[in-house]
Amino acid sequence: MEPGPDGPAASGPAAIREGWFRETCSLWPGQALSLQVEQLLHHRRSRYQDILVFRSKTYGNVLVLDGVIQCTERDEFSYQEMIANLPLCSHPNPRKVLIIGGGDGGVLREVVKHPSVESVVQCEIDEDVIQVSKKFLPGMAIGYSSSKLTLHVGDGFEFMKQNQDAFDVIITDSSDPMGPAESLFKESYYQLMKTALKEDGVLCCQGECQWLHLDLIKEMRQFCQSLFPVVAYAYCTIPTYPSGQIGFMLCSKNPSTNFQEPVQPLTQQQVAQMQLKYYNSDVHRAAFVLPEFARKALNDVS
């Protein structure tokens, strides 16, 4: 069963043929990623989406939502560490953090490591993803045991409407802009996050891939610049995401913020204590250095 030209990815066991999971999607037409499957571990349709977990030959357990890979045990750390530490290390004192999405627990795991973080609220609309992750991705879901966490199973939009001027950092760990997640890439969502942030607050959102979605990234950057005095785009590498890269849109309400230089640089001792495998202060700085085609597109340089 192949998706149509404008359709979603093939989901569930239908995406597994002859021992291989194959990811295709209209958001990255003309290309596919395949992983060899050792065992199908879980398949169920929740109220919101199709949830598939399989054990792969080389990437460990893999979580797939609506036919699109969300994380694998082998490479998830790069994305989780970056989407958490880029904003946290760009804020002078991030005590209260809000996570939208991130049901697999990876972002939460990284956020609660920070000693300055006193409380974390996570809004995840699909409780089934949380339960599946606790069972099949325990190394990611470990953060759910943190005493810093308040878990809110429900709509992040409604939660932020009721909690304004409340958070130092907001992190949105969303899936790709299809279906319900499409609204998380709109100006109205960023405006809502702005009102939920404190006066010097910082946000970081999943920002798609510069090789595939440059027009969308440019559009997002433009409306972010109309809302925030400081906006920056960064990226990291991750093998099982489309084209091997994923980006991050960062915004600050504080005009003196310099995302390219961490205000709280981690020492190598802290990196070791936090068991980081991708992020360090040099990687932080390098993440904002874009290839020329992306730099030109995002900065309107002719």
UniProtKB/Swiss-Prot annotation:
Catalytic activity annotation: S-adenosyl 3-(methylsulfanyl)propylamine + putrescine = S-methyl-5'-thioadenosine + spermidine + H(+)
SUPFAM superfamilies for this protein: S-adenosyl-L-methionine-dependent methyltransferases
Domain called PABS: residue spans = 18-253
Q: Where does the record place the modification N-acetylmethionine?
A: M1
- Superkingdom per UniProt: Eukaryota
Tell me where the transmembrane regions lie.
Answer: none
What role does this protein play? Catalyzes the production of spermidine from putrescine and decarboxylated S-adenosylmethionine (dcSAM). Has a strong preference for putrescine as substrate, and has very low activity towards 1,3-diaminopropane. Has extremely low activity towards spermidine.
Protein name (record): Spermidine synthase
Give the source species. Homo sapiens
Q: What gene name is given for the protein in this entry? A: SRM
